[in-house]
């Protein structure tokens, strides 16, 4: 934000600078600067101690010339001020004339526009009234035709609706039939799904039973020695053969049952036959499972008896030895068979060995699995009971299906009778509809003829509408042109108002600058008067000093000793210009030594006093030269600031005056300004920066409230200015809201136009 302000100030200073690069007009000149303008050769005057009266007169002439130049410069400044006042008066007169002419033009244009607008409004109102009457008559005719056509269309629609209602009723009956059939099919599909689920459950349970049987066999095999394992394997093979025989027998019975069920399926539906077959399978499997369970129980009893016999005396041991011999013979036979089997079934043996290892590892868990298997058997018995109940439910569902089939057949017969009746009614409706269609076709022909007539009338009306639209568009074009002209007039008015505001601001700034220049001229006139008074007093003192010097010289000539006269004259000659310079600078200066010496005699104390005064005067001259340099630097700075503020380029006369006065000050070097000069420049810059920031921040969007707060603290804004900035920021940041009215921040124009706050 501050970088943008700095750039803007730099651009304004660059525009305000003069292309020739000359110095600027000072705002005010102090007494010391004007007094020191003629003292540029003070160093030469102070250093040249042996100058004569001719040098003194030449210096006085120089001073007179400098005073004349200053008077000429003051007259030039006065002429410039007069010229500026004349320019100001001319600008004010031109601005008033321009405003009067613009207001007259605007009033004339406004009156002509209002008159033309009233005429156009009257013509348009008459034309629209006529057209409204014509269109109202045409619309009445069209409404009558429309009513007649709508009545005919309503009759046709009613007939078509009756036909469509009958068709919808037939479609609804067919839909009800299809819905009932689909319901039956859906019920059958549900039953099939239930049966499939039951089959899956039975398969899973049979697998579990097989697993339990295998686990029991493996646990028995692992509990005995290798010989007992071989015997158990043989027994297991025999049991497997028996199971295979049982399975083949059950398969044959199942096939017989399947044949019977297929015969039943021909009588009933396919789903009911499958259900009965599944029930028979379940019963057969349950019987087989009961047989297997009884066989396993017999094996367990046999094994327990064998264990009891083993626990008895030596007779049992002999019997066991016999059995051992028989078992050894059997082992040899089985070994031969095993050798033959190993050659043919190596892969099966490898798998069995791996399984034996796994079973050895699972010996510890076998007992737990036995207890679990007993629990599983109990669960299976409960499941068998559940299956029996499901079988009963299936029988009930079969009975329900039969009842539903009978109900469906009865419903189908009733629906067929309804369909026949509906077909008869449909035939009658078709005959009636054909007759109605003939009538409708005749009516349609009449309607087409009337429609053609309506179309012809509509085309005629459309042509008239096009003509009216063309006329309306032409009038709209005229009104748009008038509106554009009004907008241009309004824009010109706004531009004139802006120009007027700018001119008023420029005039006010010029008035301020003129006031400042008047003050500077008054100060310069006062300084000139003081200089004239000082000049006259200096001339009087010079005459007095000359008389005193002549008296001193006559006194010195009367003395006898020439050496003493020479020694006394030298310091007096060196002190003459110093006394003269002191008299020129101080109008109230008087020589106390000349007054204090009676009879014109000069002593050693007078010489010492004159030397001290000489040193004081030299120091005062040095200080005055420094002050002159500072004042010249201040004049240059004031000229620059004045041109920055007013943006006024000096005339050619100022160039000539400065070219004349330029070589008179060749040895003036810039020096550091006083604290008062810095404060004045800072005040000017402060006011200017405040004006720029106010204008910038009120015309464009600011970034945040804290920036306004910071700037208001730095620049010492008043509470009204800070509130105005906050209100403008809130208005620009909000969607809705009224524009804030500025209070004293923007000056009104001469004609008091309404300035939009942006």
Swiss-Prot record:
Region span, Disordered: 13-58, 739-758
Record-annotated membrane-spanning stretches: none
One matching Pfam family: GRIP
Alphabetical list of PROSITE patterns matching this protein: GRIP
One cellular component (GO) term of this entry: acrosomal vesicle
Membrane topology per record: Peripheral membrane protein
Residue ranges of domain GRIP in the record: 679-728
Keywords per UniProt: ADP-ribosylation, Coiled coil, Cytoplasmic vesicle, Golgi apparatus, Membrane, Phosphoprotein
Residues with PTM Phosphoserine: 30, 36, 41, 47, 50-51
Subcellular location per the Swiss-Prot or TrEMBL entry: Golgi apparatus membrane; Golgi apparatus, trans-Golgi network membrane; Cytoplasmic vesicle, Secretory vesicle, Acrosome
Primary localisation category: Golgi
Coiled-coil residues: 50-648
Post-translational modification summary for this protein: MARylated by PARP12; MARylation is required for basolateral export of E-Cadherin.
Stated role: Involved in vesicular trafficking at the Golgi apparatus level. Involved in endosome-to-Golgi trafficking. Mechanistically, captures transport vesicles arriving from endosomes via the protein TBC1D23. Recognized vesicles are then tethered to the trans-Golgi before subsequent SNARE engagement and vesicle fusion. Selectively regulates E-cadherin transport from the trans-Golgi network in tubulovesicular carriers.
Subunit comment: Interacts with RAB6A. Directly interacts with TBC1D23. Interacts with FAM91A1; this interaction may be mediated by TBC1D23. Interacts with ARL1; this interaction recruits Golgin-97/GOLGA1 onto the Golgi apparatus.
PANTHER family the record matches: GOLGIN SUBFAMILY A MEMBER 1, GRIP AND COILED-COIL DOMAIN-CONTAINING PROTEIN 1
Annotated domain remarks: Extended rod-like protein with coiled-coil domains.
UniProt-recorded name of the protein: Golgin subfamily A member 1
Species assigned in the record: Mus musculus
Protein encoded by which gene: Golga1
